[in-house]
From Swiss-Prot:
It comes from Escherichia coli O9:H4 (strain HS). It is an enzyme of class 2 (transferase). The record marks 28 as: Transition state stabilizer. One of its GO terms (cellular component) is cytosol. The gene is galK. PROSITE patterns: GALACTOKINASE (PS00106), GHMP_KINASES_ATP (PS00627). This is Galactokinase.
Amino acid sequence: MSLKEKTQSLFANAFGYPATHTIQAPGRVNLIGEHTDYNDGFVLPCAIDYQTVISCAPRDDRKVRVMAADYENQLDEFSLDAPIVAHENYQWANYVRGVVKHLQLRNNSFGGVDMVISGNVPQGAGLSSSASLEVAVGTVLQQLYHLPLDGAQIALNGQEAENQFVGCNCGIMDQLISALGKKDHALLIDCRSLGTKAVSMPKGVAVVIINSNFKRTLVGSEYNTRREQCETGARFFQQPALRDVTIEEFNAVAHELDPIVAKRVRHILTENARTVEAASALEQGDLKRMSELMAESHASMRDDFEITVPQIDTLVEIVKAVIGDKGGVRMTGGGFGGCIVALIPEELVPAVQQAVAEQYEAKTGIKETFYVCKPSQGAGQC
């Protein structure tokens, strides 16, 4: 049963009438450009064919009812006429409440809604299950009430909800790619202007995501520390963000910076340059150059930004040994566990899967999860 069928059927059973719309918003994987988003830099993600799906209908009152199919059909109810505050017990409900609350601040011309939510974006893996939920909820209200909001505004609203209501300091990339993804393309995103450029993916190349299953937590983890170190670096150069610092400027005065901050800054500056170059390499189908750029990105995350863990480095090495320069591989996401992403010629996918199955668990004691994905369309009706 598809997520659409599942949520529609649950909706009819729970609420006693049929849903009028079903909306999806995808998860994402970032091909290159890690921790650059909150430094006003560039990222190169693609939406993937794992998504959050919501079957929904407008109500004729001011009540919101939300059922979470993936959490034992837990039900949250709240009113649009009372202050929206955090739910005492359900963390998932806070993503919904946060999106609705921030949408009210943007455009308060919507009424109540019934929703049933289900998703297959792996949680806690760095594939943006939370952003896909935020964008899906925003798109539901936009579609049901014909709100004059575009994808970028729905994405910004989701980011605000996560930063201010949920309390996780995320950048804008995750929500933006979920809202604006394009089938068979990656999206080069300028995180300052929010300008996007669709970059066609080479034919015959699979986007493979391998979850290390090494558990990580982003809220309250090292993520916020890295963000502070980057802000310290930008202040040193008297710039609003590291986006505005050149590698030449950095090299001239790197010795004056705190050594740890210097390493963090160097990662951001070199990663931005790699990301812009990767977009043109991908468009030209130059997998050899893409392979080099992804390898440099991983080394920079490991040595300068220090966000990889031994399990992730092991996964990258196993994949690299199989694909050589025929494809690229690197850690993706916030770090400290999570996933690696690889661009792999389709004919090499079985060999990679076999090598990982034979070696990863033997070396780490953890069993990986392997996903072969397609670059997919952003949020909309399904």
